[in-house]
Amino acid sequence: MAPVHGDDSLSDSGSFVSSRARREKKSKKGRQEALERLKKAKAGEKYKYEVEDFTGVYEEVDEEQYSKLVQARQDDDWIVDDDGIGYVEDGREIFDDDLEDDALDADEKGKDGKARNKDKRNVKKLAVTKPNNIKSMFIACAGKKTADKAVDLSKDGLLGDILQDLNTETPQITPPPVMILKKKRSIGASPNPFSVHTATAVPSGKIASPVSRKEPPLTPVPLKRAEFAGDDVQVESTEEEQESGAMEFEDGDFDEPMEVEEVDLEPMAAKAWDKESEPAEEVKQEADSGKGTVSYLGSFLPDVSCWDIDQEGDSSFSVQEVQVDSSHLPLVKGADEEQVFHFYWLDAYEDQYNQPGVVFLFGKVWIESAETHVSCCVMVKNIERTLYFLPREMKIDLNTGKETGTPISMKDVYEEFDEKIATKYKIMKFKSKPVEKNYAFEIPDVPEKSEYLEVKYSAEMPQLPQDLKGETFSHVFGTNTSSLELFLMNRKIKGPCWLEVKSPQLLNQPVSWCKVEAMALKPDLVNVIKDVSPPPLVVMAFSMKTMQNAKNHQNEIIAMAALVHHSFALDKAAPKPPFQSHFCVVSKPKDCIFPYAFKEVIEKKNVKVEVAATERTLLGFFLAKVHKIDPDIIVGHNIYGFELEVLLQRINVCKAPHWSKIGRLKRSNMPKLGGRSGFGERNATCGRMICDVEISAKELIRCKSYHLSELVQQILKTERVVIPMENIQNMYSESSQLLYLLEHTWKDAKFILQIMCELNVLPLALQITNIAGNIMSRTLMGGRSERNEFLLLHAFYENNYIVPDKQIFRKPQQKLGDEDEEIDGDTNKYKKGRKKAAYAGGLVLDPKVGFYDKFILLLDFNSLYPSIIQEFNICFTTVQRVASEAQKVTEDGEQEQIPELPDPSLEMGILPREIRKLVERRKQVKQLMKQQDLNPDLILQYDIRQKALKLTANSMYGCLGFSYSRFYAKPLAALVTYKGREILMHTKEMVQKMNLEVIYGDTDSIMINTNSTNLEEVFKLGNKVKSEVNKLYKLLEIDIDGVFKSLLLLKKKKYAALVVEPTSDGNYVTKQELKGLDIVRRDWCDLAKDTGNFVIGQILSDQSRDTIVENIQKRLIEIGENVLNGSVPVSQFEINKALTKDPQDYPDKKSLPHVHVALWINSQGGRKVKAGDTVSYVICQDGSNLTASQRAYAPEQLQKQDNLTIDTQYYLAQQIHPVVARICEPIDGIDAVLIATWLGLDPTQFRVHHYHKDEENDALLGGPAQLTDEEKYRDCERFKCPCPTCGTENIYDNVFDGSGTDMEPSLYRCSNIDCKASPLTFTVQLSNKLIMDIRRFIKKYYDGWLICEEPTCRNRTRHLPLQFSRTGPLCPACMKATLQPEYSDKSLYTQLCFYRYIFDAECALEKLTTDHEKDKLKKQFFTPKVLQDYRKLKNTAEQFLSRSGYSEVNLSKLFAGCAVKS
């Protein structure tokens, strides 16, 4: 019993703390008296207990004084340094047992962890109730549903913790060693702004006392599923409650039921945000006028504050709580007049290890009384394993593998399974029957049609090995088929739809956080309801801010904002506005404090922000809100890559209870996080679909990167400000800055939601899922392989086929032919870092490179590969192939044998039939779109559906050739591409027979040079070609894809063109189209792209050639000057490159700039880059001598580090120059040397590369023989030898020096005029120097350095890589160009020839044009002695040349294979 003290000091600080302090106080007098009593007791003297006289055990006070005392106790944190998260003092006396308010239970739970079940007198109960019983009490203790209580959530310790922290006042800037946090109550504030009791006006200057405990609630309180502790409560909000709803952060009556606060949160939010426009402007002004970080913020503050919400729906929206009776299911009458459970399923989950044979279906159910949909979970049990045993023809001995000659019957298979298999694997009970099944896949020796033994047994019993074989059966199928797959296939469920559950059962104990739960005891009780539109969903978009802890380098979550739409339609256009309510919560890092009077600023601004004292409180609040809002879809950016993992890790570290509220399934153990596949994170959210707009954007649009800022710019056409991670901590210094941080978080959530709506992600995902028949949450994760897999699974199941087991495709590849090894080794066709193609792909015709200024016609086959599959009936079921041959790789790189086309008389196979269905459905939808006066929503719905059908049909071919696909069939894929090549070549030949020139062709399209400038004639010609080609095929169709006014064709898959677009008035406009050029790739900086675009624009223009060259020259000179003088913005230098794997997985991280920048970004926290992400970096001068690739830095590093500057030479030489040089290659009058000169670069370094590319062609054409000596030896190193007399270095590059009459031998005199010595007197030294130089070059050759021919890479290595392309070893750094010898055999041979050439006096004299010159030189200089000296030096070079085999061809060896054996 807590005594009441009249002393003010006691009431101020709390009676309990004060009395305990006195009790522990010790004094000498007290010790002496105690010792004295002990001595007497030992002596046998009786100890008498002295009863003290207590005066005033109970103090009599009036009601007002008592209220003040209770309030003071509530305000006191009596546990030191607890931050209000562990204990709660509710301020009342222990003898208040007769009080009617349920908050008493919260007090008792806070002290001893037990919740008492009190009868509720004076509470009017609704018809739908759950009786009080002992089971309810235990469930309440476990956080489950409790007995019926009127608005009682006070038992939930977590909610008490959250509210306690929300109202904990920020500590002072210089806190004392031991802090005792105290809460102060604002004048005139309601004790709990979200209280269910009607708010009453309180005179200013007085504290509103709590509502009397003995009065019943003013309104009947129906039941509702509890948000935190599982209590069933329902609150009907009133207008008066909403009026009192402004959030008072320094208030908090913690004994109020938390669930009630949650209920009124949304209506309250609407009122608060409705008043926000004016205060928001003040926030902006404060930020602009501040100093330090504020000035930084001021530079990017928006014109209109985010708090200024212009959506009226947000202010008027009110969340209506739904009454749900957990003791009854919302049943409806079925077709047979029986009571059934109807629900719309959205997501499915199974736990194969802990709950085998059970599938959880999550979705929405209609509640008639509330006229709304609520979440539901249906537990489908007893899904049995289904296995198919293929009998052998003859029994075999498993030990020897030989047949015994005994024929097999189905009874023999049954007996072997019963007596051996079932016993061994402890399968106690099973069902079996013989069935007839078809098979059409890649396992050899499996008949097309056969009788199998079908065995069904409980999934709780062990799974059989996948490679199990027996004496009587050769194969067993279905061993690892999941319960979910079996359920979806057998019940023919294709994506989200309405389902009917017959004989639904109530669950004994809640398994999910859904409002309604049901159970189907067997899968046959679940049936599809067709042609009913989907219900609206609850969509929540969220964004969060993290900050890295400097000590442990962990990301801490400091702010979260979310926008919610409670009725988001999937079959209509996105709602406007896309959200109806919202919330925002902020915490502080452990080493920060909130700005002074932050809560008062929020209150003054009337901005609705929850303030959490700790990260644990913030996470608890977020989980509570997720549970309260109960979203079906959570939308974010980079959720799977970063945010979800961080969120779950922080929940785990902070030990926030009920982590599983992030999903819908109740679980205690969090899945393992941080795996490469993100499996744990995906499982954590089961029941709530995750829509990551980054993943969706990657599938639907093309951007240079998929960061939120880039998506906002590309899709929403607006700018997003980025707040650097290191600035966040500084923003806690002032309230205005912290408010801006929250505003930025809120706006990110809004951007994310708008991007999702703009891309129509959800309707498109729903349509694709319904077409493919997979699970929508997986569709939203991207990747088409699984969709194709499920589409084919449904088709083959329906046609009584046994389907390939999951992952069985890996075994044959590893067993047969070593295909994986060869692919990894990449012997032949390695391209762009990918594995070698397992079969030949599409045909690419050799381009006729050049610039075309006449109309070019582009013809294209519509959906070539799907059309070929239909045209020739190519299917698993129709094409005959030998499986063993189909899976082997032929030796010596020979092309694999292509299977024969199926017989035209065969029935259409399943694959072409499925594709035809998709094509026909798309045609029907497009016809529907042409109807007049259609509803815009319907038009959008049709458009999304036809887009989904197109995406699915076009990706169907991919599953054949994708080696990790379940339906991988390389022979079929090879046959399809073979026919594609054949058709393209046939089309080319047909066009050429029509006297037209085909200048290029690629896979499914050809370009025809019309040599015409009349557009009408061009279209006539195109239609003529089209009709001739289409006559040959039934389903294949070629069409005019476009007309180019002018075309710059550079090489295969690289061209630029002006596309003609006819207008309604008969004229046309042109649009620039680029294909495969550097300027459309993201790994070039914007400056290089802009320069390239300008050059292309000039080349494609109608100007004269001289004008074009002049304009390009001016622009390049200007760009070179701008780069050097620093007038180009840093953003123009940013290079973007995608990661093909996680940064830490790269073997050579230093040589790859984007990889080590990615590692730096990951080390900083705030975001995590992974495989598939795009990294931005700039190449800087940092004072080191490292290569350019090792001097890459993130743009934010360049801003922060003063010692970094842009490497201008790199950008001019390795970014701008290569781009322009490649574009201008076919243009006369512009070459690499000229471009280098215009850019201010040294032109000599580009000459080597300019001539290197033509060396091979020159050799074939006899080019070097036609060159002059000067041209032939222009790149050779000159012979240098110092004069032994004066030390001057003499350079020799010819036999002669000077010209005309001044011509003389180069060895005649020293280049130093003052030196009288002649080099001819030092021929021994010259010879020695020559030998040393030759040896140096030979050593350089044998060093074997290889260098990448790609100008932007220039990777240098001595290690010969294992991957080769047709032109040589593939560069391991860039994986797109070949490595060439840095010093080739030709270069060495030419250098040796040069040394012979400069000392070959006889040859030089012979080449003189006139006899007069020859005679003069011979008489004056070339005496026999001089000629002999020259000859000695020449012979020195010739000795080495004679050892070189470069210039010799051994004919006998060359033609050895042609010898005829006698």
Swiss-Prot record:
SUPFAM superfamilies: DNA/RNA polymerases, Ribonuclease H-like, Zinc finger domain of DNA polymerase-alpha. It is found in: Nucleus; Cytoplasm, Cytosol. InterPro entries: DNA-dir_DNA_pol_B (IPR006172), DNA-dir_DNA_pol_B_CS (IPR017964), DNA-dir_DNA_pol_B_exonuc (IPR006133), DNA-dir_DNA_pol_B_multi_dom (IPR006134), DNA/RNA_pol_sf (IPR043502), DNA_pol_a_cat_su_N (IPR024647), DNA_pol_B_thumb (IPR042087), DNA_pol_palm_dom_sf (IPR023211). A zinc finger (CysA-type) spans 1283-1318. GO terms for biological process: DNA repair; DNA replication; DNA replication initiation; DNA replication, synthesis of primer; DNA strand elongation involved in DNA replication; DNA synthesis involved in DNA repair; double-strand break repair via nonhomologous end joining; lagging strand elongation. GO terms for molecular function: chromatin binding; DNA binding; DNA replication origin binding; DNA-directed DNA polymerase activity; nucleotide binding; protein kinase binding; single-stranded DNA binding; zinc ion binding. Its main location: nucleus. Residues 106-116 have a biased composition (Basic and acidic residues). A 165 kDa form is probably produced by proteolytic cleavage at Lys-124. It comes from the Eukaryota. Residues 1-33, 98-123, 232-251 are annotated as: Disordered. It catalyses: DNA(n) + a 2'-deoxyribonucleoside 5'-triphosphate = DNA(n+1) + diphosphate. Residues 650-715, 1245-1376 are annotated as: DNA-binding. The modification N6-acetyllysine is found at K224. GO terms for cellular component: alpha DNA polymerase:primase complex; chromatin; cytosol; nuclear envelope; nuclear matrix; nucleolus; nucleoplasm; nucleus. Belongs to the DNA polymerase type-B family. Component of the alpha DNA polymerase complex (also known as the alpha DNA polymerase-primase complex) consisting of four subunits: the catalytic subunit POLA1, the regulatory subunit POLA2, and the primase complex subunits PRIM1 and PRIM2 respectively. Interacts with PARP1; this interaction functions as part of the control of replication fork progression. Interacts with MCM10 and WDHD1; these interactions recruit the polymerase alpha complex to the pre-replicative complex bound to DNA. (Microbial infection) Interacts with SV40 Large T antigen; this interaction allows viral DNA replication. It is linked to Pigmentary disorder, reticulate, with systemic manifestations, X-linked: An X-linked recessive disorder characterized by recurrent infections and sterile inflammation in various organs. Diffuse skin hyperpigmentation with a distinctive reticulate pattern is universally evident by early childhood. This is later followed in many patients by hypohidrosis, corneal inflammation and scarring, enterocolitis that resembles inflammatory bowel disease, and recurrent urethral strictures. Melanin and amyloid deposition is present in the dermis. In eukaryotes there are five DNA polymerases: alpha, beta, gamma, delta, and epsilon which are responsible for different reactions of DNA synthesis. The CysA-type zinc finger is required for PCNA-binding. This is DNA polymerase alpha catalytic subunit. It comes from Homo sapiens.
